[in-house]
Regions:
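Anionic ligand-binding catalytic core segments
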Residues: 1-109
């Protein structure tokens, strides 16, 4: 792991943060790759099947991987709501929404 963050609970327990360093680099750098590290040898144009194959490689049962992908897809509208509640300029909000919807369509196919 290169970038990670720890959270400390009230009880003093430490655990990995569920998300860290999340930023849409497509807004400032439209030609940026989808991923920094390859999944199945690819950094771009990953499909739902690409992610399911990677889950299999990681020994995650396909049923669980499908459930996780579907849960991600189900967060689309709340993700878009967060975008529009942000301090981004309106033009960038619309571009960010388009990226989220494009990625959702890919995961849904």
């Amino acid at each position: 792991m290169k970038n990670f963050s720890l959270l400390t609970t009230i009880e003093g327990l430490r655990r990995l943060a569920p998300a860290y360093d999340l930023i849409c680099t497509r807004l400032p750098i439209p030609t940026d790759q989808d991923l920094a590290l390859p999944i199945g040898g690819k950094k771009n144009n990953l499909t739902r099947r690409s992610w399911l194959n990677f889950a299999g490689y990681c020994k995650i049962p396909e049923r669980a991987a499908v459930r996780l992908l579907n849960e991600q897809i189900a967060t689309t509208e709340s993700s878009v709501d967060l975008i529009y509640a942000s301090f981004l300029p309106d033009k960038l909000k619309a571009q960010y929404e388009a990226i989220v919807r494009q990625n959702t369509a890919i995961l849904s196919a």
